[in-house]
Regions:
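Structural alpha/beta surface segment adjacent to cysteine/selenocysteine redox centers
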Residues: 2-82
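C-terminal cap of thioredoxin/glutaredoxin-like
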Residues: 83-163
Length: 163
C-alpha cells in the first residue's frame, strides 16, 4: 500500500480516479484494535493514520509476535478491557500517541464495546458479501480486481482510463 500512496493521490487529484478506504478486520482482533485506533481521531486523520500503520507494520507486529500469550490473555478479559490492555501491553497506545491520538483518547476508543462490535459486524457482513479474504483488496467500478500491489493495480487503472 505504501508504494502506491503518492501515485494514487496523483490520479485522485486529476479527478479521474476516486479512492475509498474501507477497513476490514480480516485478520482478527489485532486488525480490529488497529482499525479502531485509526478511527479514534478526526475523520481526516483515518487515512494518514492507516498509512502510518502500513508503513510501520513490521514494528507493529514485533511485540505481538514476541508475546502472543500476553495478547491472547488480554483477549480473554471483559470486552471493555481487552483491547485497552492489549494496546497497553503491545505499545500501541504509545505508537498512536506519537501520531496525535492521546493515550486517554485511545483507551476510551478501545473501551467502546458498541463501536468495536459494529466494526466486527461490518467486517463479517462485507467480507463475505464482497469476498474480502485479505488486504489489500481493490475494487474497480464495482468489480474485485486481481491485484494487491501498486505494480499490479496501476496498469488496471490505466486500462480503465486513468492517466
Amino acid at each position: 500500500s505504501m508504494e502506491g500512496g503518492e501515485p494514487l493521490l496523483e490520479y485522485v487529484d486529476s479527478g479521474v480516479v476516486s479512492f475509498e478506504l474501507r477497513q476490514f478486520a480480516v485478520h482478527g482482533p489485532l486488525d480490529l484494535l488497529l482499525q479502531r485506533m485509526t478511527q479514534c481521531g478526526p475523520v481526516e486523520a483515518v487515512i494518514p493514520l492507516s498509512d502510518q500503520v502500513w508503513a510501520n507494520y513490521e514494528t507493529i507486529m514485533q511485540p505481538i509476535q514476541a508475546n502472543q500469550a500476553a495478547f491472547e490473555a488480554a483477549m480473554q478479559r471483559p470486552m471493555e478491557e481487552r483491547f485497552v490492555v492489549a494496546a497497553e501491553q503491545m505499545g500501541y497506545l504509545d505508537f498512536f500517541a506519537a501520531r496525535g491520538i492521546s493515550e486517554d483518547q485511545g483507551r476510551q476508543c478501545l473501551a467502546d464495546v458498541g463501536a468495536l462490535e459494529d466494526m466486527a459486524n461490518y467486517t463479517q457482513r462485507y467480507s463475505s458479501e464482497f469476498d474480502i479474504t485479505g488486504t489489500p483488496t481493490f475494487e474497480l467500478n464495482g468489480n474485485k480486481v486481481d491485484a494487491n500491489t501498486w505494480g499490479a493495480l496501476e496498469p488496471i487503472l490505466q486500462r480503465a482510463g486513468a492517466r
